[in-house]
């Protein structure tokens, strides 16, 4: 049994239920091709390439009376608002859609996508839904939740088969999961639960969700006691170690030279995870899990998690403005479930 699954699902995992772990490299079948002209239209002409959509063959087997897709609607760096058809086309989808959707978001610009319902990638997903997914019996169960007092509060629960189910959830998520600050913060401190975040691939949600609220020349300090790798698999991890978070121009040039063929999602991640020199990104990590020289080798700053835990005391701390010895900072206890922006900025 998978200890991570057991920890996440609790008693549900102990029941006589079959849990299938999706292998996006080997478990999929092609369902349709999104034509080049549709992709170009969806991206405003910035991306011209046909995309193959795939699904896990178990979803396509016809053995089930009903397919239920459950997930949380929350701001997302690739599709704008997470879940709905993303749960299928990426969650149990294949390499091409995963790679191309990530690259589209990087090229179009993360600031124009985060927290928005109608985005280039969502329009591509809508095409696949209209031309294939609507043939399947899929019920979407979508939640809108917020972190509150060390727990998650459920604010909305939407059930249906139509696009409007997702749109309704998005309208609530825009109100509950986007925080508007009165000004840009010179310093933002975020907390990553070690039980959830073991890689920068996942941990960099702290970068994506806060970047629009950090002042030029400011700093993002990520308290990450569980960080021990960069990628979630060896292929992506080695790619991150090779190129580092070296900035949009460097990564995009490498991409255009064909250096990321078949692993475009890594290129997109490296673009999303760079501040392009606008602000400093520092990971506070356990030196036994992530040594200083390794973290610095990919372009991030590093500091020891021990002293930072004593200084900022993140456990039990609520999101908000704080001051430490004359230094003002904004603390975020759960960056992965929100988006922080500044009032008056587009």
Question: Which residues are covered by each model-predicted region?
Answer:
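Short acidic, glycine/serine/threonine-rich loops at helix termini
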Residues: 29-36, 78-83, 151-156, 201-202, ...
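Glycine-rich phosphate/diphosphate-binding loops and the adjacent beta-loop-alpha structural elements
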Residues: 145-161, 184-202, 209
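Extended hydrophobic packing segments that form well-structured cores
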Residues: 276-346
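Conserved, well-structured core segments that form the ligand-binding/active-site neighborhood
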Residues: 15-180, 212
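Single conserved hydrophobic/aromatic residue that forms the stacking wall/gate
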Residues: 2-13
């Amino acid at each position: 049994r998978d200890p991570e699954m057991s920890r996440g699902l609790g008693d549900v995992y102990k029941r006589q239920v079959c849990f299938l772990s999706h292998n996006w490299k080997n478990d999929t079948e092609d369902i349709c091709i999104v034509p080049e002209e549709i992709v170009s239209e969806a991206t405003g002409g910035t991306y011209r390439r046909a995309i193959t959509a795939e699904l896990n063959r178990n979803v396509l087997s016809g053995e089930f009376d009903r397919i239920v897709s459950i997930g949380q609607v929350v701001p997302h760096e690739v599709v704008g608002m997470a879940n709905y058809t993303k749960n299928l086309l990426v969650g149990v989808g294949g390499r091409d859609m995963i790679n191309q959707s990530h690259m589209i978001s990087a090229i179009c610009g993360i600031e124009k996508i985060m927290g928005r319902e109608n985005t280039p990638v969502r329009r591509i997903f809508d095409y696949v839904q209209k031309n294939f997914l609507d043939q399947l019996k899929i019920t979407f169960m979508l939640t809108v939740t917020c972190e509150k007092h060390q727990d998650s509060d459920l604010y909305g629960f939407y059930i249906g088969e139509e696009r409007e189910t997702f749109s309704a959830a998005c309208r609530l998520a825009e109100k509950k999961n986007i925080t508007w600050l009165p000004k840009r913060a010179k310093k933002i401190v975020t907390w990553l639960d070690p039980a959830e975040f073991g890689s920068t691939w996942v941990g960099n949600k702290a970068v994506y969700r806060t970047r629009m609220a950090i002042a030029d020349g400011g700093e993002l300090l990520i308290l990450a006691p569980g960080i021990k790798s960069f990628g979630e698999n060896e292929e992506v991890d080695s790619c991150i170690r090779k190129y580092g978070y070296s900035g949009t121009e460097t990564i995009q040039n490498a991409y255009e030279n064909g250096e990321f063929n078949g692993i475009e999602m890594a290129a997109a991640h490296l673009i999303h995870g760079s501040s392009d020199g606008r602000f400093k990104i520092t990971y506070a990590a356990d030196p036994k899990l992530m040594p200083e020289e390794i973290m610095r080798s990919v372009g991030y700053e590093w500091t020891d998690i021990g002293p930072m835990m004593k200084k900022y005391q993140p456990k039990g701390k609520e999101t908000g403005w704080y001051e430490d010895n004359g230094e003002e900072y904004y603390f975020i206890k759960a960056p992965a479930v929100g988006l922080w922006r500044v009032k008056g900025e587009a």
